[in-house]
């Protein structure tokens, strides 16, 4: 089913509600995607892009219902990747002599995928035009490395529609086509996720290319992307966001992600986060276990952050494989204007944190001090982690911090209530984790200064997840 975009422009693409992996398994398309193809009917009929190769037959069949294929005068391929030009072989089998307009680099890519050098290719460059009748022209603009060497955009005069290729798009599937018809929170989350995970490496190219396009002084009433929505309501809002994201973007946010073998590094991550939050309550802190989290969500949060703390256990004197892989991805994404710190636990050898620090520095992060803990961190070690978080908060602050009352509160509480008054520390008989009444367990909303007798009955050991009944009074404090 086609959808009218504007006047004689129709969307003839394909929705893909089921797709969950893109670029192999490197990008999780949790909200599906769409492959946008557009049919322009003027004195000349133009097809802009096709769809993913897995929908080739369906696409050609649906296109037949819209137009006699022999009446298609021109095909424009803005991008040769298989989710854009995948149906070309099926289509060209029906209309083999139809001219294809694309960049020189696209010919190489198309032949590499489809192996038909005999097709009627026509190379276009920035500023080239194609008259399609009724006083309208297509204007071509090369956009190399946004995000492939062959990429270009196509502008339709008269209707003032920019067919923007991958730029300004998102992997987002909805029965509605236009930006003002869909859930705005979902839409902009997917826009940022798309930019962070796909276009970040090319941020240095985004601003000059947008400036070049704006320099044509052409009105833009709509931006028709290759994936996701068509921007018809205030279409330049997404252009403004791209300019913002391309300018070494950061928010007052810190991302912590880690992998752990025995939960020791998780304990460190939680304590570091506590230290950050108590020192700078304005900063957003997000924690991810890479083994249980969506990798692309982690990378989107890194993109948004002013700094990242990466934690790993030591295994065979190196970092955990999932951490190594994610750091390699961050290296390729070439994040800018961000700080980093490595941390982790180890047993007899602690080489992973040092290797991790080196890798983060190689990835372009400005490094802060790292932190190591041997074996399972005890209360003293966890306090060092909290202090590390406090120091990170101070070093990475974007504005003067509010005066902390933490130390004052602790001192006042200590003078009024001694540790002895709070009762003994309790130890889990299964995993040996120790509950200290003076420190409580903030992750379960048990405030510092809560004696064991007042800890809720639904309390679970943070390490082994067993209940209060497995706890015993710490042997060293038993009377």
Swiss-Prot record:
Fe cation 3 binds at residues 428, 431, 461, 464. Residues 30-210 are annotated as: Zinc metallo-hydrolase. It comes from Escherichia coli O139:H28 (strain E24377A / ETEC). Signal peptide: none annotated. One of its GO terms (cellular component) is cytoplasm. InterPro entries: Anaer_NO_rdtase_flvorubredoxin, Flavodoxin/NO_synth, Flavoprotein-like_sf, Metallo-B-lactamas, ODP_dom, RibonucZ/Hydroxyglut_hydro, Rubredoxin-like_dom, Rubredoxin-O_OxRdtase. Residues 423-474 form the Rubredoxin-like domain. It is found in: Cytoplasm. It holds the Pfam family Flavodoxin_1. The lineage of its organism: Bacteria, Pseudomonadati, Pseudomonadota, Gammaproteobacteria, Enterobacterales. Homotetramer. It comes from the Bacteria. In the N-terminal section; belongs to the zinc metallo-hydrolase group 3 family. Fe cation 2 binds at residues 83, 166, 227. FMN binds at residues 260-264, 342-369. This is Anaerobic nitric oxide reductase flavorubredoxin.
């Amino acid at each position: 089913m086609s959808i009218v975009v504007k006047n004689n422009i129709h969307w003839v693409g394909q929705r893909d509600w089921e797709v969950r992996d893109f670029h192999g398994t490197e990008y999780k398309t949790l909200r599906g995607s769409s492959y946008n193809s557009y049919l322009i009917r003027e004195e000349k009929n133009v097809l802009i892009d096709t769809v993913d190769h897995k929908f080739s037959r369906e696409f050609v069949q649906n296109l037949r219902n819209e137009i006699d294929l022999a009446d298609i005068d021109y095909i424009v391929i803005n991008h040769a990747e298989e989710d854009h030009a995948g149906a070309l072989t099926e289509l060209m089998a029906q209309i083999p002599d139809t001219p294809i307009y694309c960049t020189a680099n696209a010919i190489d890519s198309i032949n590499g995928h489809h192996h038909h050098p005999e097709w009627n290719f026509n190379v276009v460059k920035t500023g080239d035009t194609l008259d399609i009748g009724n006083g309208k022209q297509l204007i071509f603009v090369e956009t190399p490395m946004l995000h492939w060497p062959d990429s270009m955009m196509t502008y339709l005069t008269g209707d003032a529609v920019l067919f923007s290729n991958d730029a300004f798009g998102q992997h987002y599937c909805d029965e509605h086509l236009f930006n003002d018809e869909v859930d705005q929170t979902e839409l902009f989350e997917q826009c940022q996720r798309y930019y962070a995970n796909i276009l970040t490496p090319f941020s240095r190219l985004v601003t000059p290319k947008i400036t070049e396009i704006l320099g044509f002084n052409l009105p833009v009433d709509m931006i028709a992307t290759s994936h996701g929505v068509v921007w018809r309501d205030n279409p330049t809002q997404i252009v403004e966001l791209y300019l913002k994201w391309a300018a070494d973007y950061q928010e007052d946010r810190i991302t912590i992600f880690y992998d752990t073998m025995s939960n020791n590094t998780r304990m460190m991550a939680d304590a570091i986060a506590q230290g950050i939050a108590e020192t700078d309550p304005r900063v957003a802190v997000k924690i991810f276990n890479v083994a249980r989290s969506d990798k692309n969500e982690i990378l989107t949060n890194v993109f948004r952050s002013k700094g990242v703390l990466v934690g790993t256990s030591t295994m065979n004197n190196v970092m955990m494989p999932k951490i190594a892989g994610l750091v390699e991805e961050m290296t390729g994404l070439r994040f800018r204007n961000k700080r980093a710190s490595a941390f982790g636990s180890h047993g007899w050898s602690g080489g992973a944190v040092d290797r991790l620090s080196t890798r983060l520095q190689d990835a372009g992060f400005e490094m802060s001090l790292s932190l190591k803990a041997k074996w399972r961190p005890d209360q003293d070690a966890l306090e060092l982690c909290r202090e590390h978080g406090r120091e990170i908060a101070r070093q990475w602050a974007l504005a003067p911090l509010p005066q902390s009352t933490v130390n004052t509160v602790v001192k006042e509480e200590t003078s009024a209530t001694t540790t002895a008054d709070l009762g003994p520390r309790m130890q889990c008989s299964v995993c040996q984790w120790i509950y200290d009444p003076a420190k409580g367990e903030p992750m379960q909303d048990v405030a510092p200064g809560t004696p064991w007798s007042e800890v809720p009955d639904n309390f679970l050991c943070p390490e082994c997840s067993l209940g209060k009944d497995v706890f015993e009074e710490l042997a060293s404090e038993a009377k």
